């Protein structure tokens, strides 16, 4: 827009900001909704900016200089769940109201299920092995159609002395990725 009286111009489009506010209550720990790839997100705890000691997953979000976060995954429906004990978030893709599974054409979701030597934000945050479900498994970030990303660091998300995991097509037993010798 242009103001002819004051010779000032304004933005032609105002980009929406996705507000993800969490509180330490049963109802306040989980956000479910649609997010567009590249969307600007405000991650807040009780209405305040995300504290520096909270872990945000670089596979899902990129922190910007202004304190907002850019959503890196493809456009879709997601669950973002705050873990106040470990000051972090668990994030997974959704199909309606259910966790997303891998589709026959390669779209959907890929999950990691493993022993207590792997998890996010740290390998010992969810310290029980081979359990299934969104509280235990790691959903890979879909960054493009049929392209998934996960970043794991030895000593943080991977225990250096004992790591054992597999890729699955759902947050449960079922579709399992296997090598040629299996």
Question: Residues of each region from the PLM?
Answer:
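Insoluble glucan recognition modules
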Residues: 1-182
